[in-house]
């Protein structure tokens, strides 16, 4: 049972307005969703989900920055980065109910809204508009992942950096150099050279 504080949490109310802007939601659907959304504040590098465990939640960034990553041969490979209003989750595990290939953690101090996938499925069954919202949000998530994969396969490192510089400059400034290099599929040294060429600076979060 949600508490009064949860029902009237400003961050959750703001997130519900964002959802309503994505697709119209009835007052009944918004009230039901508010009972299933939980907000927490986390410090930098707080682990939300660990690789090899079965995922149970979706995470929506209210404030801050999250990343999804995979441990491979002793290294962390950053798969996705998410700022405000982004959704991060171990979708492979949520859909298959098998252990996940990915971990999710905060990159900076963050406010995160979570919803249990089981609760979301119950909302899908009860409210058609919530099912549509979920479909739209998951489609957006997959399109972002597909764009990132396509970029890695068909663009040079410099072209990938240029895309971020044009479309998401805040992500460049807020993401530590090592995470950003991993996300772009290059070494930190290569990223430093590219940033220097394009007038960037590594004074922003130069360390992990």
Task: Identify what each model region corresponds to.
Residues 77-135:
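Cyclic-nucleotide recognition modules
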Residues 14-15, 141-150:
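Short, Lys/Arg-enriched N-terminal segment that forms or immediately precedes the first helix
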Residues 48-53:
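Short phosphate-coordinating micro-motif centered on Lys-Gly-acidic
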Residues 45, 56-67, 84-85:
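Glycine- and acidic-residue-biased ligand/ion/polar-headgroup-sensing regions
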Residues 38, 65-70, 111-112:
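Short beta-strand segments in beta-sandwich/barrel cores
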Residues 155-208:
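Phosphate-/nucleic-acid-contacting segments
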Residues 1-38:
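Cyclic nucleotide-binding regulatory module and flanking cytosolic helices
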């Amino acid at each position: 049972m949600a508490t009064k504080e949860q029902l009237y949490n400003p961050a959750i109310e703001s997130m519900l307005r964002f959802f309503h802007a994505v697709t119209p939601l009835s007052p009944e659907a918004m009230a039901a969703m508010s009972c299933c959304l939980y907000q927490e504040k986390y410090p930098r590098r707080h682990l939300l989900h660990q690789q090899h465990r079965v995922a149970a939640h979706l995470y929506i960034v209210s404030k801050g920055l999250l990343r999804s990553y995979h441990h491979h041969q002793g290294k962390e490979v950053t798969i996705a980065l998410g700022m405000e209003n982004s959704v991060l989750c171990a979708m492979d595990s949520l859909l298959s109910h098998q252990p996940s290939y990915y971990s999710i953690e905060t990159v900076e101090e963050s406010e995160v809204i979570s919803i249990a996938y089981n609760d979301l499925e119950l909302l899908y069954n009860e409210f058609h508009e919530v099912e549509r919202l979920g479909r739209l949000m998951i489609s957006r998530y997959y399109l972002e992942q597909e764009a990132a994969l396509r970029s890695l396969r068909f663009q040079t490192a410099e072209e990938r950096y240029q895309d971020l510089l044009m479309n998401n400059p805040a992500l460049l400034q807020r993401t530590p150099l090592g995470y950003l290099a991993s996300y772009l599929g290059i070494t930190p040294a290569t990223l430093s050279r590219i940033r220097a060429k394009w007038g960037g600076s590594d004074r922003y979060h130069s360390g992990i």
